[in-house]
Amino acid sequence: HGRGRVSTETAAHIMQIAKELGYEPNPAGKALAARKKQSHVAVILPSEGNPFFDEVIRGLQTSAEFYSSYGLKMELYTMKGYNAQIQLDILNRVSQSVEALIIDPIDDESIREALDKLVDEGKFIVTVNNDASTTKRHCYVGADYENSGITACALLAALTKARANVGIVLGNRQLLGHCKRLEGFFQRMDSLPDFHVAAVV
Protein backbone atom coordinates (compact mmCIF):
# COMPACT_ATOMS: atom_id res chain seq x y z
CA HIS A 1 0.00 0.00 0.00
CA GLY A 2 3.03 2.32 -0.25
CA ARG A 3 2.99 3.57 3.35
CA GLY A 4 6.74 3.19 3.82
CA ARG A 5 6.61 0.54 6.59
CA VAL A 6 8.60 -2.09 4.66
CA SER A 7 11.96 -1.90 2.93
CA THR A 8 12.21 -1.01 -0.75
CA GLU A 9 13.48 -4.52 -1.56
CA THR A 10 10.59 -6.23 0.27
CA ALA A 11 8.05 -3.93 -1.37
CA ALA A 12 9.48 -4.68 -4.83
CA HIS A 13 9.37 -8.44 -4.12
CA ILE A 14 5.72 -8.25 -2.99
CA MET A 15 4.76 -6.20 -6.06
CA GLN A 16 6.43 -8.77 -8.34
CA ILE A 17 4.52 -11.63 -6.71
CA ALA A 18 1.24 -9.68 -6.97
CA LYS A 19 1.91 -9.06 -10.65
CA GLU A 20 2.65 -12.75 -11.31
CA LEU A 21 -0.57 -13.75 -9.53
CA GLY A 22 -2.62 -11.16 -11.45
CA TYR A 23 -3.65 -9.31 -8.30
CA GLU A 24 -6.06 -6.39 -8.80
CA PRO A 25 -6.92 -3.91 -5.99
CA ASN A 26 -10.45 -4.35 -4.64
CA PRO A 27 -12.58 -1.18 -5.15
CA ALA A 28 -14.84 -2.21 -2.26
CA GLY A 29 -11.82 -2.53 -0.01
CA LYS A 30 -10.59 0.86 -1.12
CA ALA A 31 -13.99 2.36 -0.36
CA LEU A 32 -13.97 0.86 3.14
CA ALA A 33 -10.48 2.24 3.75
CA ALA A 34 -11.48 5.65 2.41
CA ARG A 35 -14.36 5.86 4.88
CA LYS A 36 -11.83 6.07 7.71
CA LYS A 37 -10.90 9.55 6.48
CA GLN A 38 -13.56 11.63 4.80
CA SER A 39 -12.66 14.23 2.19
CA HIS A 40 -14.76 17.36 2.51
CA VAL A 41 -15.55 19.45 -0.57
CA ALA A 42 -17.32 22.80 -0.27
CA VAL A 43 -19.32 24.15 -3.22
CA ILE A 44 -20.13 27.88 -3.30
CA LEU A 45 -22.63 29.02 -5.94
CA PRO A 46 -24.62 32.25 -6.48
CA SER A 47 -27.58 30.04 -7.28
CA GLU A 48 -30.47 31.41 -5.22
CA GLY A 49 -33.17 32.63 -7.58
CA ASN A 50 -31.13 31.59 -10.63
CA PRO A 51 -32.56 28.52 -12.44
CA PHE A 52 -29.35 28.24 -14.51
CA PHE A 53 -27.79 26.41 -11.56
CA ASP A 54 -30.57 23.85 -11.05
CA GLU A 55 -28.96 21.24 -13.33
CA VAL A 56 -25.48 22.08 -12.02
CA ILE A 57 -26.59 21.39 -8.46
CA ARG A 58 -28.42 18.22 -9.49
CA GLY A 59 -25.26 16.93 -11.17
CA LEU A 60 -23.12 17.78 -8.14
CA GLN A 61 -25.54 16.02 -5.80
CA THR A 62 -25.63 12.91 -8.00
CA SER A 63 -21.83 12.76 -8.10
CA ALA A 64 -21.53 13.39 -4.37
CA GLU A 65 -23.94 10.52 -3.66
CA PHE A 66 -21.94 8.18 -5.92
CA TYR A 67 -18.57 9.05 -4.37
CA SER A 68 -19.81 9.12 -0.79
CA SER A 69 -18.88 5.43 -0.47
CA TYR A 70 -15.29 6.50 -1.17
CA GLY A 71 -15.31 8.94 1.73
CA LEU A 72 -16.34 12.09 -0.12
CA LYS A 73 -18.62 14.56 1.62
CA MET A 74 -19.96 17.58 -0.28
CA GLU A 75 -21.34 20.67 1.42
CA LEU A 76 -23.31 23.12 -0.73
CA TYR A 77 -23.38 26.82 0.13
CA THR A 78 -25.61 29.11 -1.90
CA MET A 79 -26.04 32.87 -2.10
CA LYS A 80 -28.28 35.30 -3.94
CA GLY A 81 -26.66 37.71 -6.37
CA TYR A 82 -23.05 38.74 -6.70
CA ASN A 83 -21.98 40.44 -3.49
CA ALA A 84 -18.24 39.87 -3.04
CA GLN A 85 -18.36 40.39 0.73
CA ILE A 86 -21.04 37.74 1.17
CA GLN A 87 -19.03 35.27 -0.91
CA LEU A 88 -15.87 36.12 1.03
CA ASP A 89 -17.69 35.55 4.33
CA ILE A 90 -18.78 32.09 3.15
CA LEU A 91 -15.22 31.33 1.98
CA ASN A 92 -13.75 32.30 5.34
CA ARG A 93 -16.39 30.32 7.22
CA VAL A 94 -15.90 27.02 5.39
CA SER A 95 -12.28 27.08 4.23
CA GLN A 96 -10.68 25.45 7.28
CA SER A 97 -13.03 22.45 7.35
CA VAL A 98 -12.56 21.31 3.73
CA GLU A 99 -9.83 19.84 1.54
CA ALA A 100 -11.25 21.15 -1.74
CA LEU A 101 -13.45 23.94 -3.02
CA ILE A 102 -15.67 24.32 -6.10
CA ILE A 103 -16.70 27.94 -6.63
CA ASP A 104 -18.35 30.25 -9.14
CA PRO A 105 -16.16 33.21 -8.19
CA ILE A 106 -17.09 36.87 -8.21
CA ASP A 107 -14.43 38.89 -10.05
CA ASP A 108 -13.15 40.83 -7.05
CA GLU A 109 -9.64 41.24 -5.62
CA SER A 110 -10.73 40.03 -2.18
CA ILE A 111 -11.99 36.76 -3.68
CA ARG A 112 -8.84 36.28 -5.77
CA GLU A 113 -6.63 36.83 -2.72
CA ALA A 114 -8.71 34.38 -0.66
CA LEU A 115 -8.46 31.69 -3.35
CA ASP A 116 -4.68 32.11 -3.62
CA LYS A 117 -4.38 31.82 0.17
CA LEU A 118 -6.37 28.58 0.14
CA VAL A 119 -4.15 27.11 -2.60
CA ASP A 120 -1.08 28.07 -0.54
CA GLU A 121 -2.64 26.19 2.39
CA GLY A 122 -2.93 23.06 0.25
CA LYS A 123 -6.60 23.24 -0.75
CA PHE A 124 -7.63 22.07 -4.24
CA ILE A 125 -9.58 24.83 -5.99
CA VAL A 126 -11.89 24.40 -9.00
CA THR A 127 -13.63 27.41 -10.54
CA VAL A 128 -16.88 26.67 -12.34
CA ASN A 129 -18.96 28.71 -14.81
CA ASN A 130 -16.79 31.79 -14.22
CA ASP A 131 -13.02 31.68 -13.95
CA ALA A 132 -10.47 33.39 -11.75
CA SER A 133 -7.68 32.86 -14.26
CA THR A 134 -5.16 35.18 -12.60
CA THR A 135 -5.26 33.11 -9.40
CA LYS A 136 -3.46 29.88 -8.53
CA ARG A 137 -6.68 27.85 -8.90
CA HIS A 138 -6.06 24.32 -10.18
CA CYS A 139 -8.60 24.18 -12.99
CA TYR A 140 -11.65 25.82 -14.55
CA VAL A 141 -14.81 24.06 -15.76
CA GLY A 142 -16.96 26.20 -18.02
CA ALA A 143 -17.41 27.97 -21.33
CA ASP A 144 -14.87 29.87 -23.42
CA TYR A 145 -16.61 33.22 -22.96
CA GLU A 146 -14.23 35.25 -25.10
CA ASN A 147 -14.84 32.94 -28.04
CA SER A 148 -18.60 33.11 -27.48
CA GLY A 149 -18.38 36.92 -27.75
CA ILE A 150 -16.44 36.62 -31.00
CA THR A 151 -19.07 34.20 -32.31
CA ALA A 152 -21.96 36.48 -31.28
CA CYS A 153 -20.43 39.43 -33.13
CA ALA A 154 -19.71 37.35 -36.23
CA LEU A 155 -23.29 36.05 -36.36
CA LEU A 156 -24.77 39.52 -35.86
CA ALA A 157 -22.50 40.92 -38.56
CA ALA A 158 -23.66 38.20 -40.95
CA LEU A 159 -27.31 39.04 -40.24
CA THR A 160 -26.82 42.79 -40.73
CA LYS A 161 -24.36 42.58 -43.63
CA ALA A 162 -21.75 44.08 -41.27
CA ARG A 163 -23.46 47.49 -41.09
CA ALA A 164 -25.15 48.23 -37.77
CA ASN A 165 -25.35 50.26 -34.57
CA VAL A 166 -25.66 47.72 -31.79
CA GLY A 167 -26.88 47.94 -28.20
CA ILE A 168 -25.43 45.35 -25.81
CA VAL A 169 -27.16 44.24 -22.61
CA LEU A 170 -24.52 42.78 -20.29
CA GLY A 171 -25.41 40.57 -17.36
CA ASN A 172 -23.01 41.59 -14.61
CA ARG A 173 -19.57 43.21 -14.75
CA GLN A 174 -18.63 41.44 -11.52
CA LEU A 175 -18.50 38.16 -13.45
CA LEU A 176 -15.33 37.57 -15.43
CA GLY A 177 -17.20 35.46 -17.99
CA HIS A 178 -19.53 38.32 -18.90
CA CYS A 179 -16.60 40.73 -19.28
CA LYS A 180 -14.69 38.21 -21.41
CA ARG A 181 -17.72 37.80 -23.65
CA LEU A 182 -17.81 41.57 -24.18
CA GLU A 183 -14.05 41.62 -24.92
CA GLY A 184 -14.55 38.92 -27.54
CA PHE A 185 -17.36 40.89 -29.16
CA PHE A 186 -15.20 44.03 -29.44
CA GLN A 187 -12.25 41.98 -30.66
CA ARG A 188 -14.28 40.67 -33.62
CA MET A 189 -15.85 44.10 -34.19
CA ASP A 190 -12.39 45.68 -34.75
CA SER A 191 -12.37 44.14 -38.24
CA LEU A 192 -15.81 45.58 -39.12
CA PRO A 193 -15.52 49.31 -39.99
CA ASP A 194 -19.29 49.86 -40.38
CA PHE A 195 -20.23 48.00 -37.21
CA HIS A 196 -20.62 50.13 -34.07
CA VAL A 197 -21.78 49.72 -30.47
CA ALA A 198 -24.16 52.49 -29.46
CA ALA A 199 -24.26 51.52 -25.78
CA VAL A 200 -23.48 48.78 -23.27
CA VAL A 201 -25.94 48.52 -20.40
Question: Where do the model's predicted regions map?
Answer:
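Hydrophobic alpha-helical
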Residues: 94, 99-119, 185, 196-201
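Short, well-structured alpha-helical segments in soluble
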Residues: 83-99
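Amphipathic helical "hinge" segments at domain boundaries
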Residues: 24-86
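N-terminal helix-turn-helix DNA-binding module of bacterial transcription factors
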Residues: 1-35
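An alpha-beta-alpha
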Residues: 60, 152-195, 199-200
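Flexible loop/hinge segments that line or gate small-molecule binding clefts
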Residues: 103-147, 158, 165
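Short, surface-exposed alpha-helical segments at coil->helix boundaries
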Residues: 11, 53-61, 88, 146, ...
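Periplasmic-binding protein-like
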Residues: 42-44, 98-105, 124-128, 166-169, ...
